């Protein structure tokens, strides 16, 4: 990945965290953005958020205009990518893997 794209994704991640924190909705401003992936043309960004509630995605979609406006004002960019929000399930996967490894370790200890 090139350095420009990495820098853009990093900046966008920070700006999105600030944008969510500035919203009046307590569910949205407590969300954590874990990762941002920009498309090759940088017109679209996939935003991974840490939440177990699927209803939060509809709230984020409704607030997308406010979030993009905040990003534009805070960054000074000419254009903000279109944001698509996705629930980040990597933590759940990691916890499942840890549980499996713990079971394997217990099985070896019992032998």
Swiss-Prot record:
GO terms for cellular component: cytoplasm. Pfam families: RBFA (PF02033). One of several proteins that assist in the late maturation steps of the functional core of the 30S ribosomal subunit. Associates with free 30S ribosomal subunits (but not with 30S subunits that are part of 70S ribosomes or polysomes). Required for efficient processing of 16S rRNA. May interact with the 5'-terminal helix region of 16S rRNA. This is Ribosome-binding factor A. Keywords: Cytoplasm, Ribosome biogenesis. The keyword Cytoplasm applies. It is found in: Cytoplasm. GO terms for biological process: maturation of SSU-rRNA. It comes from the Bacteria. InterPro entries: KH_dom-like_a/b (IPR015946), RbfA (IPR000238), RbfA_dom_sf (IPR023799), Ribosome-bd_factorA_CS (IPR020053). Monomer. Binds 30S ribosomal subunits, but not 50S ribosomal subunits or 70S ribosomes. Belongs to the RbfA family. The keyword Secreted does not apply.
